[in-house]
Amino acid sequence: MVQQAESSEAESNLPRDALDTEEGEFMACSPVALDESDPDWCKTASGHIKRPMNAFMVWSKIERRKIMEQSPDMHNAEISKRLGKRWKMLKDSEKIPFIREAERLRLKHMADYPDYKYRPRKKPKTDPAAKPSAGQSPDKSAAGAKAAKGPGKKCAKLKAPAGKAGAGKAAQPGDCGAGKAAKCVFLDDDDEEDDEDDELQLRPKPDADDDDDEPAHSHLLPPPAQQQPPQLLRRYSVAKVPASPTLSSAAESPEGASLYDEVRAGGRLYYSFKNITKQQPPPAPPALSPASSRCVSTSSSSGSSSGSGAEDADDLMFDLSLNFSQGAHSACEQPLGAGAAGNLSLSLVDKDLDSFSEGSLGSHFEFPDYCTPELSEMIAGDWLEANFSDLVFTY
């Protein structure tokens, strides 16, 4: 509407002969001028009703015809680019006649096609990967198909050995295509021997942090006489131990036939050791938390400083029972002395330690390097019965 008001003001300022010449050009190029009596002046051959031209279309139609007469070899896209730049450079007073003609065509369009509604064509969404272009050779398309199937084949190779081990075993979905640091982990642990072979075959080179952790705890391995079979030791190097087991998990976890159970926490797979009998020395833990390492140093220093073997065994048993019952953090903060030992009887400590070894709670507070012969005999003996009621504390 503002443009119409400006057009009326501009018409009064423009000379009349100029308006007559412009109107003559509009009428010459306008579809209405060709055949005003034709009701289908804005329809295509297929019956589609075209949109009414705006001011730019009216102007560009005239200018395009002039350019095509001067240079017929110029490309249509180049003509449109030049016309767009020239239209932006025009003054508002120069655009007014074309705006007026566009308004007249719009009103004519509304009168001839009252039920018209603009419905833009919906372009079909074509997938470029699904349909190769017509100009593309079949060799290139076949190569592209092979490249697309490459990652799928790699995943199938990784999953093939896992399918042999058992139906319940499968690789994690994020392992395929994750890079060299990907770890193939099993979800179930029904068959230990098959799991061990498959895991050692499928597991790529471990991360840098795993390599750094293993040499640091190599001194905690038991002597050759007490070492376990090489298969178990290989599985321990692969497994991860949870940082701090609790008493509730000890009471809830049933004692199964497998040596260790899998615990999934925070999206990462861990292993907790199970069914460690009293006659077998406990395995070396692959990873220790900072709090547990402080407890190791405290218990080792107290055990080495005492003179007699019986005192070493008593101190170590008290340290282990205190760490197990109250947690790593509280045990390291409390002073380990004879005054605190008076509150706990030796039989209760022995029962706690014995039930802890039989209950297979998966704790990492087990130090085979610091076990004295007296303590090993006490642990190996069957003179106490394990009772879980000793582990229950009422407040």
Curated annotation (Swiss-Prot):
Required for transcriptional activation activity and synergistic coactivation of transcriptional activity with POU3F2: region residues: 363-395
Main location: nucleus
InterPro entries hit by this protein: HMG_box_dom, HMG_box_dom_sf, SOX-12/11/4, SRY-related_HMG-box_TF-like
DNA-binding annotation, residue ranges on this chain: 49-117
GO biological process: brain development; camera-type eye morphogenesis; closure of optic fissure; cornea development in camera-type eye; embryonic digestive tract morphogenesis; embryonic skeletal system morphogenesis; eyelid development in camera-type eye; glial cell development
CDD domains listed in its UniProt record: HMG-box_SoxC_SOX11
Region of interest: Disordered: 1-22, 114-258, 276-312
Described purpose of this protein according to its UniProt entry: Transcription factor that acts as a transcriptional activator. Binds cooperatively with POU3F2/BRN2 or POU3F1/OCT6 to gene promoters, which enhances transcriptional activation. Acts as a transcriptional activator of TEAD2 by binding to its gene promoter and first intron. Plays a redundant role with SOX4 and SOX12 in cell survival of developing tissues such as the neural tube, branchial arches and somites, thereby contributing to organogenesis.
Name of protein: Transcription factor SOX-11
Source organism: Rattus norvegicus (Rat)
